[in-house]
Amino acid sequence: MAMVVSTWRDPQDEVPGSQGSQASQAPPVPGPPPGAPHTPQTPGQGGPASTPAQTAAGSQGGPGGPGSDKQQQQQHIECVVCGDKSSGKHYGQFTCEGCKSFFKRSVRRNLSYTCRANRNCPIDQHHRNQCQYCRLKKCLKVGMRREAVQRGRMPPTQPTHGQFALTNGDPLNCHSYLSGYISLLLRAEPYPTSRFGSQCMQPNNIMGIENICELAARMLFSAVEWARNIPFFPDLQITDQVALLRLTWSELFVLNAAQCSMPLHVAPLLAAAGLHASPMSADRVVAFMDHIRIFQEQVEKLKALHVDSAEYSCLKAIVLFTSDACGLSDVAHVESLQEKSQCALEEYVRSQYPNQPTRFGKLLLRLPSLRTVSSSVIEQLFFVRLVGKTPIETLIRDMLLSGSSFNWPYMAIQ
C-alpha cells in the first residue's frame, strides 16, 4: 500500500502567504449607508463573498475535506509484517501492536526460533502465531531494526546513525546504515572478551593445561554462538551454515585468540596436546614447533595492529561469509554478505582512523594468512584432551543442529 501520510501537506502550508494575499487584494465591501436599518446578512443575501482562504479553511474542517482524508489514510495503514491494522511506526516500520511486541521481545531476550517446515511459512493476520521463526524473519526482511529495540524509540524519519557502544567502551561514530550493521555484529558476541578468563588478559602468565583447554573451548563456543546471532546467517540454509563454519572455524579461532590476547607458551601447549606423554621423533617435534610458531606469528601480527572490537567483528564476518565453502546453495548471496561486511569495515576505518589511510588494507591482508594455521594442529593442541578423536567439524554440526551451543555435550561451559 502506498504510504502518502508523511508527504501530505495542508493546502495552506503549500504556498505560505498566497491565500492571505488574495484576501487582502479583494476590494472592500462598502458598509450600509448611515441610518439604514441593520439586518443580519447570510450567504446569498448580499453579504460579502467568501474569500478563497475562508473557502479552503471551511472545506478542511468539513467532514469530507482533506483533513478527514488524512485521518482515514492513517487509520487504514496496514502492518507491513502481517497486514493487520497498524498502530504506528515501530522500530522503523508501520506495524501492529502484536508484531511490535513480538519483535521487541525476540530481540531483547535474544530468542532463537526453529521452523518446522521449509522456512517459508505464510505470515498474515491469521497465521502470524504459527511460526515464530518465519515471523521474525519477515520482521527483519521488511526492515524492522534490531538496534532500535536496543536503543529505545527512535524518530521515525531519522536515519540510524550516531554512537553505538563497542565492547571496549569506544564510541562508533558512523553516519550510515553500515554502522548499525557493525553494532549488530558486536551485540552478537555471547559474552565480552574479558569473560574469556582473567588469565587470558595477562600475556606473561603461563596458563595451566586445564585453563588452556577451557579457554579454547570457550573461544570455539564463542565463534559458533556469534555466528548464530549475527544478521543474515540464521536465514541461510542449515547446510550452508554448517559448510561455512566447518571451513572457517579455525580462522575464527585465531581471530578470537588474538582478540583476547591468548598466551601461547610452547611448553603448556605441548602438554595440552599430550605430546609429553609419548615419545616423539625429532622430525615430529620440529614440525609441531613450526606450527606453533606460525600460530604465534599470526596472533602477534594482529595484536600489533591494535585491532579494536568493531574491526574484529567485521573481520570475522568477512572470514565467515566466504564463497569458498563447498556445496553452498546460494553462492551469490553469501558473496553479497561478505561484500557488505567489507564495506562496513572500510567505512568504519575511514571514519575512526582518518590518519591511517593504509589501515584498511593492512587489516584485509591479514586474512589470507590465517589459513596458514592448520586446523588439524589447532585440534591437536587444544581439543584432543576434551573430545578425543571427535572431529571439530562434527562438534560444529551438532551445535548448529541442536539449536544452541550452550548444550553441546562434550564439556560444561560455565
Curated annotation (Swiss-Prot):
Residues 337-414 are annotated as: Important for dimerization. Residues 76-151 bind DNA. PROSITE patterns: NR_LBD, NUCLEAR_REC_DBD_1, NUCLEAR_REC_DBD_2. Pfam families: Hormone_recep, zf-C4. Residues 38-54 have a biased composition (Low complexity). It comes from the Eukaryota. It is found in: Nucleus. GO terms for molecular function: DNA binding; DNA-binding transcription factor activity; nuclear receptor activity; protein homodimerization activity; retinoic acid binding; RNA polymerase II cis-regulatory region sequence-specific DNA binding; sequence-specific DNA binding; zinc ion binding. A zinc finger (NR C4-type) spans 79-99, 115-139. Residues 117-414 are annotated as: Interaction with ZFPM2. Interacts with SQSTM1. Binds DNA as a dimer; homodimer or heterodimer with NR2F6. Interacts with NCOA1, NCOA2, NCOA3 and PPARGC1A. Interacts with ZFPM2. This is COUP transcription factor 2. The gene is Nr2f2.
